[in-house]
């Protein structure tokens, strides 16, 4: 997966798609980490402007039956993104279930789901529905709290990319420029970051 991210930044999209199809996507696996990695790579490809074809639908089919699992907020938001990518009604069902779990759950994950999972899932769903302003409004307040949700820095970086792209698309110029400048300071050699910085300051 990390090798695919390196190829992605190099712009070798055909190789990344081939690696996804041949190595990363496992039709037999329902392992949550596999599904999260699949969703993350597909979304990153789209952020790079790559058409991923029908690949979202294959991942979404595995997520549809897991809208009430709530193992980790980190997993739920990836499932929400995947279901929203194909405009599946289960995206809304997952959000409603997640909201209820955040209120009523009695394990350690419930308050994290309420604080971070619920607004982040709402933001990702809004993003996939093309409501970029709403995506920004949901995601900005929780952007610094994401480490509580789990996952590695590389895994969580997807949400920073989506927020920056949403801010640009929503015409939130000041926010987009601030996010882009902050990101460029952290990763000046990253091709997507440089391109997003150019987009933000051209708006």
Which residue ranges define each predicted feature?
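Helix-coil-helix junctions within alpha-helical repeat/solenoid scaffolds
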Residues: 5-203
């Amino acid at each position: 997966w990390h090798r695919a991210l390196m190829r992605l930044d190099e712009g070798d999209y055909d190789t990344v798609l081939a690696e996804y199809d041949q190595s990363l996507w496992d039709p037999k696996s329902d392992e949550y980490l596999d599904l999260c990695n699949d969703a993350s790579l597909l979304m990153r490809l789209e952020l790079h402007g790559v058409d991923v074809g029908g690949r979202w639908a294959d991942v979404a089919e595995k997520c549809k039956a897991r809208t009430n699992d709530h193992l980790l907020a980190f997993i739920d938001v990836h499932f929400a993104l995947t279901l929203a990518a194909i405009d599946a009604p289960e995206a809304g069902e997952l959000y409603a279930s997640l909201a209820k779990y955040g209120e009523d759950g009695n394990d350690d994950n419930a308050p994290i789901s309420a604080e971070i999972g619920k607004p982040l899932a709402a933001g990702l769903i809004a993003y996939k529905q093309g409501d970029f302003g709403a995506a920004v409004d949901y995601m900005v307040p929780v952007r610094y709290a994401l480490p509580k949700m789990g996952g590695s820095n590389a895994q969580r970086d997807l949400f920073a990319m989506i927020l920056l792209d949403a801010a640009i698309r929503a015409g939130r110029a000041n926010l987009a420029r601030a996010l882009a400048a902050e990101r460029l300071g952290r990763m000046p050699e990253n091709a997507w970051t440089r391109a997003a910085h150019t987009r933000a300051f051209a708006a």
